Every structure is written in C-alpha cells, then in structure tokens.
A protein has these predicted regions:
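An internal, D/E-rich "acidic patch" concept
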Residues: 1-59
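Phosphate-coordinating loops and pocket residues in cytosolic domains that bind phosphorylated ligands
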Residues: 26, 78, 109, 179
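Short helix-coil transition/hinge motifs at the ends and kinks of transmembrane helices
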Residues: 11-20, 25, 108-125
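Membrane-water interface segments at the C-terminal ends of transmembrane alpha-helices
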Residues: 2, 6-10, 80-111, 138-144
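Hydrophobic aliphatic residues
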Residues: 4-8, 12, 25, 100, ...
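Hydrophobic alpha-helical segments of integral membrane proteins
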Residues: 1-8, 21, 32, 36, ...
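Glycine-rich, flexible loop/turn motifs
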Residues: 17, 21, 103, 108, ...
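Alpha-helical transmembrane segments of integral membrane proteins
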Residues: 40-44, 49-73, 89, 116-228
C-alpha cells in the first residue's frame, strides 16, 4: 500500500470498517466523511435516477428488438446502439450541450440549482431536477447502447428455450409467451447487470460531473488527484 501511494499519513487503517476514514489533508484539514458526505448524496441520487430512466427505456426496447430480430427496425436500433456505445462520454455530452443549451436553449449547462434562489420544499426539488435534466439525459443516453444489446441478447436466448416452444405449442398468446415466460427467464442475467451498475454508482461519473460542474464524487476524485 505504501508503494502504491495510498498509505494513510499516520500509517494506520484503524476505524475504516466503522466508517472512520481519518482526515482529508487538502487546503483545509477536515474529516473525510465530512468531505464526501454531500458529494456522495449527489452522485448516488443522480446515478439512481439515470439507472431507472435507462432501464425504463432499454427493457422494452431490448424486448422489441429480440421479438423483431432481423427486421429493419431491429437493425436500425442496433446500429444506433453501437454508435452510442462507441462514442466517448464527453463527445455525447458536447453534442447534447450544443443541441439543448446553444441551438435550443432549453436547459442550463452547469450547477445544481438557480444561484441565489429562495426556493424551498417542492420548488427546490423541481429547480434541482431542472438543472439535472441535461446530465441525466447524457448519462441515460450513454447507457442505452450497452444495456439494449444486453437485454436483446438475453431475450433472444430465452425465446429459443424449449419451454417457450412448448408454451407456443399449447396455443398461448404471443404476448403471454413473451412477458410471462420468456421475460422471466431473461431477467436473471439482467438483474446481475443492474446489481453491478448499482455497485458502480458510488464511483461517480467523473467526466459528466466535471463537464456540468456537479458537486459529486467525480469532482472529489479530480480535486484529490490535482491537489498538491
């Protein structure tokens, strides 16, 4: 650990398992938990929203592509998914900033709420959601490509199972076969993927948080790396 440069200054890890991470020796000496508490809340909040939005889009889209496998619409969605998956996050962010903040000035591009706003309660929540719209759109879009293809692959595998052929042979409606039988079998690997995503929530979205000036864990990482 000392060779990696991550050894604490006092050389001890006592208290880590109890959430006592010691002090942060930045411009001002503060307890680590005090430094990361608010950024952690922001990062978890925005990542959970982005995950929910992405799942709400990719699950029906992946099922549709699996059912319509080989069709023109499936091919079109797959091409779009590959393009979206291949583009770097900052390129997608720049494109959306140009589209929704410059060409069509709909959303703000930085901050988390209106500076000096007197909002409280529900208005404060709505104001923050308004400022989070563009980062959420970018994060959701960045997730669509990989997740859509994953759901599609899981559904195609489920639809080829013997139990699905048996269900169709019994004369069940196609909708029942897809959603009551195939989807249940395809759900297991998808749940595994989602759990992995939630574990990655705490790492923060470094690039997006930096570009949109969001006070999250991503910015904390950058500040820690660039501090003397």
């Amino acid at each position: 650990l000392a060779w990696l440069g991550i050894m604490p200054i006092d050389g001890e890890f006592r208290g880590v398992l109890q959430g006592e991470f010691g002090n942060s020796y930045g411009s001002v000496v503060k307890p680590v938990m005090e430094v990361i508490k608010e950024p952690m809340k922001t990062t978890v909040w925005i990542n959970i929203l982005a995950t929910v939005l992405a799942l709400g889009i990719t699950i029906p889209l992946g099922i549709f592509c699996a059912v319509k496998k080989g069709s023109k619409r499936d091919t079109l969605i797959q091409v779009g998914s590959i393009i979206g998956y291949s583009l770097p996050t900052f390129i997608i962010a720049i494109l959306f900033i140009f589209l929704f903040a410059i060409l069509l000035p709909v959303f703000p591009v930085s901050g988390m709420n209106t500076p000096g706003s007197p909002y409280t309660g529900i208005m404060s929540i709505l104001d923050r959601l308004y400022y989070m719209c563009l980062p959420l759109i970018v994060m959701t879009f960045c997730s669509l490509g990989g997740m859509t293809r994953f759901v599609r692959a899981s559904m195609i595998e489920a639809l080829s199972m013997d139990c699905i052929r048996t269900a169709r042979a019994k004369g069940l409606k196609e909708r029942t076969v897809i959603y009551s039988h195939a989807w249940r079998n395809a759900l297991i690997p998808i749940v595994t993927l989602v759990i992995g995503w939630f574990l990655g929530i705490f790492s923060g979205s470094v690039m997006i948080e930096q570009m949109f000036e969001i006070n999250g864990m991503g910015r904390v990482y950058i500040q820690a790396l660039t501090s003397n």
